[in-house]
Amino acid sequence: MLYKGDTLYLDWLEDGIAELVFDAPGSVNKLDTATVASLGEAIGVLEQQSDLKGLLLRSNKAAFIVGADITEFLSLFLVPEEQLSQWLHFANSVFNRLEDLPVPTIAAVNGYALGGGCECVLATDYRLATPDLRIGLPETKLGIMPGFGGSVRMPRMLGADSALEIIAAGKDVGADQALKIGLVDGVVKAEKLVEGAMAILRQAINGDLDWKAKRQPKLEPLKLSKIEATMSFTIAKGMVAQTAGKHYPAPITAVKTIEAAARFGREEALNLENKSFVPLAHTNEARALVGIFLNDQYVKGKAKKLTKDVETPKQAAVLGAGIMGGGIAYQSAWKGVPVVMKDINDKSLTLGMTEAAKLLNKQLERGKIDGLKLAGVISTIHPTLDYAGFDRVDIVVEAVVENPKVKKAVLAETEQKVRPDTVLASNTSTIPISELANALERPENFCGMHFFNPVHRMPLVEIIRGEKSSDETIAKVVAWASKMGKTPIVVNDCPGFFVNRVLFPYFAGFSQLLRDGADFRKIDKVMEKQFGWPMGPAYLLDVVGIDTAHHAQAVMAAGFPQRMQKDYRDAIDALFDANRFGQKNGLGFWRYKEDSKGKPKKEEDAAVDDLLAEVSQPKRDFSEEEIIARMMIPMVNEVVRCLEEGIIATPAEADMALVYGLGFPPFHGGAFRWLDTLGSAKYLDMAQQYQHLGPLYEVPEGLRNKARHNEPYYPPVEPARPVGDLKTA
């Protein structure tokens, strides 16, 4: 053994060939700060071996290296710029020394090689991969850019266009694509990986392969003519501006850095990468996006822990077809759980099956599946007008009309048709679960399961624990949601649960602004372009359905009369009374017509201004700051109340529910991350300016306490240690 650390070791293989093996405790390898330091020590040992002829890098895990240790990022991002720059220089010196070894090197790459894992293999001369490879640089999705030489080596290896596509979008690619663009040199079966890598290494040692020529382009300026450079970088900047926009500085910074570094050799180019990385790491956007990643891991880990002793349902059923029922049935069948779809109406069943078939056909068009797979999936959805097959199902989700009487009747009838251990769930969006449970003989087997529309796209499923829901019931429903590829978050019961409970105060803020003379077009523009929501409130209401919102608003007002009962006729009432229900009937805040692809396209409609004039004061202008404050304060206050009342368990789960369920702008990180970034005291000052607007603007006592003591909602993070203090792994 030449070297042994906690996460990697170095040993001789044969004839002067050494192997460096990543083998961290646990299930995956990560390139954390200690592992980078260890790698440096191992390379130091190699540099002393006069009889070294070649080096093989490999992993003892199912994945090569999944990336840097993102749990370290928040503490690294807190250190002063100079200290972070020193750490990057240190890490890059390690990869440079790997690249500069006076012998040929090869990485045998299996599974994931992402972020730092990808940057590590870019420093070797050759790369051989297995068919399950996923390789790429996802850093821009975390608000940063590659920092271990990825933005320098990849363009010089692949050419600017292919590298920009991966780096700017934060993409990873599979084995076939990686081979096609030159990111790997070959793909072999897993059992042949080491043998194949050794064969390439021997050819390089024997002089049959010119490894020095292979290495050289990575050390030199990017080979690109002036015209080619102008075209590549102009197109890339245009694409980034269109897709990422101003709220995500990392992609455009990465493109500009690659452009600026193109004319330099490795050392100068790495210095430019360092200078660009450090300021990005100190942005609020990077902290928020890293926070989302960590919260996502936390939420998924919680679901995994909850379901460790529970069997995933093998057969499911959906009550109520139509678009929503068809979407749920498709998602379940697509992920391998056969489903019975029941409705009392043949037309609705046809609609549900058509929806499932449409979604599968889209997968076929994209080349994700073939005709055989499509037929196989659709054959596991069984439409029925009766309860045939319900005696075999493990779980049933009810998705009928949002009416408590109808839901209670359907659930009570279904309970008589299923096994005593079958779990029942309701896809209600607002009706308290404990109220629906009153109709059941086995309320412990019942809970809420709130999907978001469109089901196949929206990652969140709210799992609602009723007063009598058992732990086993919750675990089974969480297991099914996870199997469906969704992110389940368990919340406690109340009107609107978590997501709708916090959404309707936001809509109330919108209604009050309109009442006071604001223009809905400006509000939408500000909330989309400035705050960063995917849709402004008017457009969102049109998509949700004005009739749906009108009904839900009444349910919420009954549930929380002190805050949510209004004493005036608002814009939602006016549009509802005029039969303007949004996209579903082509008339809402806008008029809708189908475009060439059959998607609704919004157009101005002067008639809506006349309708709104009946419920509004004369038009006046509001500043962007006031619009954002008046829209967001009611929502954030309600989010805080939900945490204080135990409706949602943690700030992490609240923020993920907002991002995955409502499209809360990821670069803000969620309501609690936004609050922490703004500071509770500053938020309190802002909110107090609007408390005259009513109870929705009154800041909860818990938040006032946070402001008084200057406490964040997320646990404080300690800055990382200086480079000199690093311990090896």
Curated annotation (Swiss-Prot):
The keyword Lyase applies. The record marks 119, 139 as: Important for catalytic activity. Pfam families: 3HCDH, 3HCDH_N, ECH_1. This is Fatty acid oxidation complex subunit alpha. In the N-terminal section; belongs to the enoyl-CoA hydratase/isomerase family. Pathway: Lipid metabolism; fatty acid beta-oxidation. Substrate binds at residues 296, 500, 660. Keywords: Fatty acid metabolism, Isomerase, Lipid degradation, Lipid metabolism, Lyase, Multifunctional enzyme, NAD, Oxidoreductase. It catalyses: a (3S)-3-hydroxyacyl-CoA + NAD(+) = a 3-oxoacyl-CoA + NADH + H(+); a (3S)-3-hydroxyacyl-CoA = a (2E)-enoyl-CoA + H2O; a 4-saturated-(3S)-3-hydroxyacyl-CoA = a (3E)-enoyl-CoA + H2O; (3S)-3-hydroxybutanoyl-CoA = (3R)-3-hydroxybutanoyl-CoA. The active site is at residue 450. Involved in the aerobic and anaerobic degradation of long-chain fatty acids via beta-oxidation cycle. Catalyzes the formation of 3-oxoacyl-CoA from enoyl-CoA via L-3-hydroxyacyl-CoA. It can also use D-3-hydroxyacyl-CoA and cis-3-enoyl-CoA as substrate. GO terms for biological process: fatty acid beta-oxidation. NAD(+) binds at residues 324, 343, 400-402, 407, 429, 453. It comes from Escherichia coli O17:K52:H18 (strain UMN026 / ExPEC). GO terms for cellular component: fatty acid beta-oxidation multienzyme complex. HAMAP family: FadB (MF_01621). PANTHER family: TRIFUNCTIONAL ENZYME SUBUNIT ALPHA, TRIFUNCTIONAL ENZYME SUBUNIT ALPHA, MITOCHONDRIAL. InterPro entries: 3-OHacyl-CoA_DH_CS, 3-OHacyl-CoA_DH_NAD-bd, 3HC_DH_C, 6-PGluconate_DH-like_C_sf, ClpP/crotonase-like_dom_sf, Enoyl-CoA_hyd/isom_CS, Enoyl-CoA_hydra/iso, FA_oxidation_alpha_subunit. The keyword NAD applies. Heterotetramer of two alpha chains (FadB) and two beta chains (FadA). Its EC number is 4.2.1.17, 5.1.2.3, 5.3.3.8, 1.1.1.35. Residues 311-729 are annotated as: 3-hydroxyacyl-CoA dehydrogenase. GO terms for molecular function: 3-hydroxybutyryl-CoA epimerase activity; delta(3)-delta(2)-enoyl-CoA isomerase activity; enoyl-CoA hydratase activity; long-chain-3-hydroxyacyl-CoA dehydrogenase activity; NAD+ binding. The lineage of its organism: Bacteria, Pseudomonadati, Pseudomonadota, Gammaproteobacteria, Enterobacterales. Residues 708-729 are annotated as: Disordered.
